[in-house]
Amino acid sequence: MGARVTRALRNFNVEKRAEREISKRKPSMAPKHPSTRDLLQEHRSQYPEIEEVVSKKDNKLLSLLRDVYVDSKDPVPALPVKVEPRQEPKEFRLPIGNHFDKNITDIPKGKITVVEALTLLNNHKLSPETWTAEKIAQEYYLELKDVNSLLKYFVTFEVKILPPEDRKAIQSK
């Protein structure tokens, strides 16, 4: 039922709406730059016959255009195209352990590795009096605002192991 109603609304007064759209003013050309306008006026005044030639229909060209017939067909492929199944990319894993960063040798000033970031976060966490933001920025050649953002928004994981006697205190339901 809903499609019938929407179709009726969509087709309501179609001719009138189409006629209104067709009779609208067409968009005009963008205004020309004043220097270009002057050059065009000068060129038109020197060669007035060009405008006549451009606006006149050339019967010879029109007759040649009427004789043109284009018939296109897709060429038959000589060999059948083999569709091979796409190969899945091989699985890539980083080596196990902390030795995966050995390939990183040259780090520009103002940048740090993940290991260095974790180290400085841990140092600041363990002794914030000695590892202040200013000292970290000076040590790792970083900007102070970046170090402050790093210390504010990033923290290292804290693993808490509950002693066995605390587990007994928690009763199951």
From Swiss-Prot:
Transmembrane segments: none annotated. Residues 16-40 are annotated as: Disordered. Keywords: Calmodulin-binding, Lipoprotein, Membrane, Mitochondrion, Myristate, Phosphoprotein. Phosphorylated on serine. Prolactin stimulate serine phosphorylation. A lipid is attached at G2 (N-myristoyl glycine). It is found in: Mitochondrion; Membrane. The modification Phosphoserine is found at S35. GO terms for biological process: defense response to virus; mitochondrial respiratory chain complex I assembly; NADH dehydrogenase complex assembly. The keyword Disulfide bond does not apply. May be involved in cell proliferation and survival of hormone-dependent tumor cells. Involved in the assembly of mitochondrial NADH:ubiquinone oxidoreductase complex (complex I). Binds calmodulin. Interacts with NDUFAF3. This is NADH dehydrogenase [ubiquinone] 1 alpha subcomplex assembly factor 4. It comes from Mus musculus (Mouse).
